[in-house]
């Protein structure tokens, strides 16, 4: 589109834009607001599609929020078991067995004792304790059944809830 310029009173040509807007020394507040809106579209609060972009790989493309398990720093030293108060493996005084809930690896090496039974089993077992049944046989029966408790992270089977709890805590610390 061609426009003809008309000579102004001073003999020069008139600007194509209006003089009132261009000659003002102060910038328009409308232009600043538009610029601010453009800057805030990357902010998740202002961009409704931000989460969708993150899921499909668009957006900022930053690293995953989850840290890899291998790079997690080691936590504070092991605390005593919150259930029984015993020290964890390595911190137990000599001659004292460590807590089975804090250290399930130790629990699998030791023979099953009354501590490792579930609450319901303790009430039923006292009548059987006098019978001549080998202690190792109880564990063999559970292995054939595949255990009663299963880890949701790795599908391992455990005989009692305490062992499952200890195993799951190892997952939480990133040790398994």
Swiss-Prot record:
- Tell me which UniProt keywords the record has, alphabetically: Metal-binding, Phosphoprotein, Zinc, Zinc-finger
- Compositionally biased, Basic and acidic residues: which spans? 126-138
Q: Where are the zinc fingers (C2H2-type)?
A: 149-171
Has keyword Zinc-finger?
A: yes
- Sequence ranges of Acidic residues compositional bias: 16-46
Renumbered residue ranges of the record's region Disordered: 1-152
Q: Which PROSITE patterns match?
A: ZINC_FINGER_C2H2_1, ZINC_FINGER_C2H2_2
Offer an example of a GO molecular function term for this protein.
zinc ion binding
Q: Which residues cross the membrane?
A: none
Q: Which residues carry this modification: Phosphothreonine?
A: 96
Protein name per the record? Zinc finger protein 428
* Protein species of origin: Mus musculus
Q: Specify the taxonomic lineage.
A: Eukaryota, Metazoa, Chordata, Craniata, Vertebrata
